[in-house]
UniProtKB/Swiss-Prot annotation:
A motif (Nuclear localization signal) lies at residues 736-739. The record marks K627 as: Mammalian adaptation. The lineage of its organism: Viruses, Riboviria, Orthornavirae, Negarnaviricota, Polyploviricotina. InterPro entries: Flu_PB2_2nd, Flu_PB2_6th, Flu_PB2_C, Flu_PB2_CAP-bd, Flu_PB2_middle, Flu_PB2_N, INV_PB2, PB2_helical. GO terms for biological process: 7-methylguanosine mRNA capping; cap snatching; DNA-templated transcription; symbiont-mediated suppression of host cytoplasmic pattern recognition receptor signaling pathway via inhibition of MAVS activity; symbiont-mediated suppression of host gene expression; symbiont-mediated suppression of host mRNA transcription via inhibition of RNA polymerase II activity; viral RNA genome replication. GO terms for molecular function: RNA binding; RNA-directed RNA polymerase activity. Belongs to the influenza viruses PB2 family. This is Polymerase basic protein 2. Plays an essential role in transcription initiation and cap-stealing mechanism, in which cellular capped pre-mRNAs are used to generate primers for viral transcription. Recognizes and binds the 7-methylguanosine-containing cap of the target pre-RNA which is subsequently cleaved after 10-13 nucleotides by the viral protein PA. Plays a role in the initiation of the viral genome replication and modulates the activity of the ribonucleoprotein (RNP) complex.
Amino acid sequence: MERIKELRNLMSQSRTREILTKTTVDHMAIIKKYTSGRQEKNPSLRMKWMMAMKYPITADKRITEMVPERNEQGQTLWSKMSDAGSDRVMVSPLAVTWWNRNGPMTSTVHYPKVYKTYFEKVERLKHGTFGPVHFRNQVKIRRRVDINPGHADLSAKEAQDVIMEVVFPNEVGARILTSESQLTITKEKKEELQDCKISPLMVAYMLERELVRKTRFLPVAGGTSSVYIEVLHLTQGTCWEQMYTPGGEVRNDDVDQSLIIAARNIVRRAAVSADPLASLLEMCHSTQIGGTRMVDILRQNPTEEQAVDICKAAMGLRISSSFSFGGFTFKRTSGSSIKREEELLTGNLQTLKIRVHDGYEEFTMVGKRATAILRKATRRLVQLIVSGRDEQSVAEAIIVAMVFSQEDCMIKAVRGDLNFVNRANQRLNPMHQLLRHFQKDAKVLFQNWGIEHIDNVMGMIGVLPDMTPSTEMSMRGIRVSKMGVDEYSSTERVVVSIDRFLRVRDQRGNVLLSPEEVSETQGTEKLTITYSSSMMWEINGPESVLVNTYQWIIRNWETVKIQWSQNPTMLYNKMEFEPFQSLVPKAIRGQYSGFVRTLFQQMRDVLGTFDTTQIIKLLPFAAAPPKQSRMQFSSLTVNVRGSGMRILVRGNSPAFNYNKTTKRLTILGKDAGTLIEDPDEGTSGVESAVLRGFLILGKEDRRYGPALSINELSNLAKGEKANVLIGQGDVVLVMKRKRDSSILTDSQTATKRIRMAIN
């Protein structure tokens, strides 16, 4: 107060005012502070001071020919004085106004293309909706977020090559554009930016924004996708938040979201197959997300999520060194431990073999809706500070930490037997057994934990076993905080190994991830996910299995056909027919298979009975282990649409309908593709059609006139002879039989005779 009075007193004297406004600053330290180095020390003051001058801007000398000396109001636009230390002229801000209004017009066609990210942002904001502002305490935690909506996912190096190729195509320097995305983008941008007059440097900057993911470590409460982050300053403050719905989606957010869904589906499916790792790799390599190969996305996309990281580990990519337990990401911040096996008894006297962490360690735990700091010693929780969105989220974090602590009172709180299994019906490991048990019901765990009196610490309160907050008492070692715990900020990636059962370990052998950690949450992907692998056909239910199986046969018909005739057993064992078996009633699978295999064998033996449509229709039924029986079927049942539907052995049905004229196959009304019938069917002139009712006499005999086509044969009278053109352009002499004999003997002798006649 005294100082202020003194200052006021000084300011009232005219001499003080004069000293402050008129005298020069000659103190060396001050001069040094403001003149050393190139860095501007007070940019906003400098700007204000410059703009108060008459000619604060410098411009190229050519400006004097392009801009008049005075504008319509008679104000001077540029000074005849040169800028000190350069050959530029001094210009008034009014010259900029004149230029904007009267300067030369250039084509604006490239602006929306170059400044695409800005134009799109304006559109999103225009169509976005801002809701009410709420005042409340914001629990923000720092997370690594994507700050640049609408980008591709190229690495900095890949983007640099693309930019050089697009903007400076004639510059020297080795540029290798390898990835598909690089080539597509380069081609697209070169076309878009033909004759572009915007400065190359600007184009390069803008391209970088479009191609590379930029991340920052920012305090966030709420949505973390890039379309929310771009308005972070509008949606959350220290004590307020504003509701906001983005006015558009961007591909990078959609890719992230769809990648997580695809990875979860693939890990869940692989976990139940005979060889999880091989299956997972097969699925990753054959899946596309929004038209891009999933493996390409995995190589470029930095999303950290359990399933995504398992897929990356399988591909030999580096991942974050943090580990996952109970849906929380744990990062050790200090301490160390060694691991040793111990056998512990549960409250139900069941023995659990557990890897105990021996030593003092501190961790941060970050989940979707709660975060915590955990300090633990050997089998003892020392302290847990939790913060979360709501009571439920806080409870989830507490359960995970209590199980992770491996404390005796937690193990003794188990009631009943632990026999949880994973999707493949294998028992879970002991730690996950405990976790599942208490996630189902944590009442006994919380009651047995013990409570303690607490000191009053700013920003922290206690929590009782029934999850009510308290300022006097709390569960032992556990406090709830208003402040969130920041996510682990480092982007460091480590080399990991993965075993056959998809357990991911770091180089010290610690398990970082396993399929048990993959969330069961189902979502709808924003981009189309195309799983080409037959293992994923089941994901959309029985109908999709039916359609996909037949589509696969049609797409691969050329190879299937050869295998069908030469190596049927190998064909029947193809994994693509596995999903189909779940549609066939279990009791009759074997009989169907035996029946179809016998039918096929007859087709192979009896030339001329080959029937493409029928083979395609019945092939999936032959994949089950066959039972020998004398049963014949006129229709086969498949379980789709909640009931049995019939597929007719001969003829069409809703489940399998082939239109001979359009050559289209429809399965349950869905198009399954075009069938290219074999030339050896119908009337196209190969052995099979020759055989029925004709006797082959030998090589061509000119006396019987020119060779007829197979269609013309039908006009022959019984006993009449003719030359006929068969399949491979060979001509043989045939005679129409005098009586209709068995097709079978005809066919067999015919093949032998054709061979003899041709040779």
